Amino acid sequence: MKGLNYMLCIPHTSVSRSMLEAQCRRLINNIPGWELIRVENMMRLRCTFTFPDFREALAFTNSVGELAEAEQHHPELITEWGKVTVTWWTHSVKGVHMNDFIMAARTGVVANI
């Protein structure tokens, strides 16, 4: 399989569905540091990135924001002093879609992990 960070997000259609948990558990190994969580009965991908100060955390947040805008797929970003928690999921499918794995991998590239 081509590296997730090199893949492009695909547009959603009315028949797009969330991935099964078993599929997610197989793919999670391809994105180091990420975990599969369930919130409001929906699977999500989450990772917390650490930084030496708020300035670098904010710069990372802005870089992820640029990436999200370019793909028109947006994560939940929680920026705090020295850390940023990024959570990806797809509202329209009520769970995790392949695009979320792609964006998580690309987020890791932004963080240099």
From Swiss-Prot:
Swiss-Prot/TrEMBL keywords: Lyase
Signal peptide annotation: none
Reactions it catalyzes: (4aS,6R)-4a-hydroxy-L-erythro-5,6,7,8-tetrahydrobiopterin = (6R)-L-erythro-6,7-dihydrobiopterin + H2O
Top enzyme category: lyase
Keyword Protein transport found: no
GO function terms (MF aspect): 4-alpha-hydroxytetrahydrobiopterin dehydratase activity
Gene Ontology BP terms: tetrahydrobiopterin biosynthetic process
Top-rank lineage group of the source organism: Bacteria
EC number: 4.2.1.96
A Pfam family reported for this protein in Swiss-Prot or TrEMBL: Pterin_4a
InterPro entries named among the record's database cross-references: PCD_sf (IPR036428), Pterin-4-alpha-carb_dehyd (IPR050376), Pterin_deHydtase (IPR001533)
Keyword Lyase applies: yes
NCBIfam families for the chain: PRK00823.1-1
PANTHER family hit by this protein: PTERIN-4-ALPHA-CARBINOLAMINE DEHYDRATASE-RELATED (PTHR42805:SF1)
Family: Belongs to the pterin-4-alpha-carbinolamine dehydratase family.
This protein's name: Putative pterin-4-alpha-carbinolamine dehydratase
Lineage: Bacteria, Pseudomonadati, Chlorobiota, Chlorobiia, Chlorobiales
